[in-house]
Amino acid sequence: MSAVLDLTCELIARPSVTPDDAGCQTLLAARLKQAGFQCDHLRLGEVDNLWATHGQGAPVLVLLGHTDVVPPGPREAWASDPFTPQIREGVLYGRGTADMKGSVAAFVVAAEQFVAAHPDHTGTLAVLLTSDEEGDAIDGVRHVARLFAERGQRIDWCITGEPSSTATLGDLLRVGRRGSLSAKLRVQGVQGHVAYPEKARNPIHQAAPALAELSARRWDDGYESFPPTSLQISNIHAGTGANNVIPGELEVDFNIRYNPHWDAPKLEAEITALLDQHGLQYTLKWHRSGEPFYTPEGTLRATARAVLAEHIGRAPEESTGGGTSDARFIAPLGAQCIEVGPVNASIHQVDENVRVDELEALPGLYQRLVERLLV
């Protein structure tokens, strides 16, 4: 097997369901130390974080990834054990193949090959890994970024290995991500018998106009390559289960994916004002997952576009779509951030997989990116 295929299989065999690293970072740190990297383990609580650097000074280029995976679900639903890597007809199957142990293995192999070829390269090449990307994302890169801010650690460029490609490796370059803000709304009413509505206060009826206004509102018309901001109601719960009882409380969960027109405080204030206009008796609990980030035209974006175009024979699509990634914690440090990784068609699914030929091409892709930036 190739170096990247062998290492990917070793990582898949470690059942690192978030936030358990299951020894992945110990394995990777040993490889990086042997290649001449200085490795710092930044564990917090149950979360493992690894910061490995080679070289010194600016510019600082970070390869950002995660060693944790989502739970596999019922084992019997898989064609083969999710933590026993298996190749069938040129495709590697296993939990984490695409998201994102394949990219992590490719990072390490590319880093090894790069420093062997360019031991006295310009600036600093760093690898940052966490076991808390798929979970709460509190003690992982968010924590490390806070440490970096306190230390004054500079980061110029960040390449995240999230599975960004859609049909073939390199066909999409992620140049930003929307912010994510979640809320739990509780509307208080007065429980009562449905035959005596005058003695009760129905929170569903009271909240319905406000929810209709929230869901129908057009927040903006988009920003650069970002789509318009979107609010989606994800859960609604009220009632006792009986059809003759007016509920005493309504609970609503919603999420907003927003572009750089907004930040979390502005959205929170806007939504609170809207709810107040409807005279509701309510509480609102917010959870800020991360602000949006966007990498405008510059050295990193232009370099990545050129490298991907050489690989696929045409210019890649440049997008800000998808969910959130840990790059949202690195961007506020002043870094230009992009995401380049394998095809995302099977991520978080049963029988997650990656094509072997595309996995084996990934280290070369990353190495060319690093060489264009640090040589």
UniProtKB/Swiss-Prot annotation:
Record keyword Ligase present: no
GO biological process, one term: L-arginine biosynthetic process
Keywords: Amino-acid biosynthesis, Cobalt, Diaminopimelate biosynthesis, Hydrolase, Lysine biosynthesis, Metal-binding, Zinc
Cofactor requirement: Zn(2+); Co(2+)
One Pfam family, short name: M20_dimer
Co-factor binding details: Binds 2 Zn(2+) or Co(2+) ions per subunit.
Domain of life, per lineage: Bacteria
EC number: 3.5.1.18
PROSITE patterns: ARGE_DAPE_CPG2_2
Pathway in which this enzyme or protein is active: Amino-acid biosynthesis; L-lysine biosynthesis via DAP pathway; LL-2,6-diaminopimelate from (S)-tetrahydrodipicolinate (succinylase route): step 3/3
Example of a GO MF term: zinc ion binding
Family membership: Belongs to the peptidase M20A family. DapE subfamily.
PANTHER family: ACETYLORNITHINE DEACETYLASE, N-ACETYL-L-CITRULLINE DEACETYLASE
Entry-linked HAMAP family: DapE
Name of the featured protein: Succinyl-diaminopimelate desuccinylase
The species this protein was found in: Stenotrophomonas maltophilia (strain R551-3)
